[in-house]
């Protein structure tokens, strides 16, 4: 038996004894980045608003966290939390729509896929809607349409800016035409808001697709997106099969849409609140007291013909 064989045989027959005691790591203590696989202490990640400290990837967050990040502490008031969906079509796939709703509500603690309310953003009143992808992929049904319409009307009534954080797979198929109607319903409320001379800012997060993209997500005075967010209408595979050609690797990303004029600006999550506050201040109507000073000139007020 060679020395190499002896060591190999010893390795098989004798267990390796470690001189340290394995420690159990508590669940949730560390978080793995979906993009670069880096492990980050969860508290550090939360302090950076769930943006990877290594590669800048924006991890998915949900409505409660989004509201905490954008609204000043102690100023948030929910609107229409009791509004809940029904099953007008008696829809059934693998299970009934009613059962699916009950199960999702129990798992998420949400009544539907959007939460709305009013609060202060750096001291400025705003009407805010936040879509939550946990609830059936953030799909837009009649309750989402109703809550967002009421939110916009509240903003118009109070003459405050409206901000909607979009995260959705599109219209909810279980509600059929009733879900598609919400596209026009929300768009109509936004048009009345615009006619009143008021600001609307949609924030497109990962993912924003389908009927949401085809309606209120693209109707803002300024369209904002988070970095690398998937934004589109139909899915990539559907488009490739229809066109019979390969699409660019960055197709339907926030960066691709900005390069082609569909998105105005891409704002990292860590700068979002500050950017929104600046935009709101810039769009505030000028008060009568804030008249611009007249430029002094030695030339006569009227020039001879």
Swiss-Prot record:
Domain CoA carboxyltransferase N-terminal residue range list: 29-298
Subcellular location: Cytoplasm
EC number: 2.1.3.15
GO biological processes: fatty acid biosynthetic process; malonyl-CoA biosynthetic process
Enzyme class per UniProt: transferase
Subunit structure, interactors included: Acetyl-CoA carboxylase is a heterohexamer composed of biotin carboxyl carrier protein (AccB), biotin carboxylase (AccC) and two subunits each of ACCase subunit alpha (AccA) and ACCase subunit beta (AccD).
Pathway(s) it belongs to: Lipid metabolism; malonyl-CoA biosynthesis; malonyl-CoA from acetyl-CoA: step 1/1
One GO term describing the cellular component: acetyl-CoA carboxylase complex
Family of the protein in this entry: Belongs to the AccD/PCCB family.
Molecular functions per Gene Ontology: acetyl-CoA carboxylase activity; ATP binding; carboxyl- or carbamoyltransferase activity; zinc ion binding
Cofactor(s) named in the record: Zn(2+)
A Pfam family that the UniProt record links to this protein: Zn_ribbon_ACC
Catalytic activity: N(6)-carboxybiotinyl-L-lysyl-[protein] + acetyl-CoA = N(6)-biotinyl-L-lysyl-[protein] + malonyl-CoA
Recorded superkingdom: Bacteria
Organism (species): Synechococcus elongatus (strain ATCC 33912 / PCC 7942 / FACHB-805) (Anacystis nidulans R2)
Task performed by this protein: Component of the acetyl coenzyme A carboxylase (ACC) complex. Biotin carboxylase (BC) catalyzes the carboxylation of biotin on its carrier protein (BCCP) and then the CO(2) group is transferred by the transcarboxylase to acetyl-CoA to form malonyl-CoA.
Renumbered zinc finger spans (C4-type): 33-55
Co-factor binding comment: Binds 1 zinc ion per subunit.
Annotated gene: accD
Highest classification ranks of the organism: Bacteria, Bacillati, Cyanobacteriota, Cyanophyceae, Synechococcales
Main location per the UniProt record: cytoplasm
InterPro entries tied to this protein: AcCoA_carboxyl_beta, Acetyl_CoA_COase_Trfase_b_su, ClpP/crotonase-like_dom_sf, COA_CT_N, Znf-ACC
Entry keyword set: ATP-binding, Cytoplasm, Fatty acid biosynthesis, Fatty acid metabolism, Lipid biosynthesis, Lipid metabolism, Metal-binding, Nucleotide-binding, Transferase, Zinc, Zinc-finger
Protein name: Acetyl-coenzyme A carboxylase carboxyl transferase subunit beta
Residue numbers binding Zn(2+): 33, 36, 52, 55
Keyword Transcription regulation assigned: no
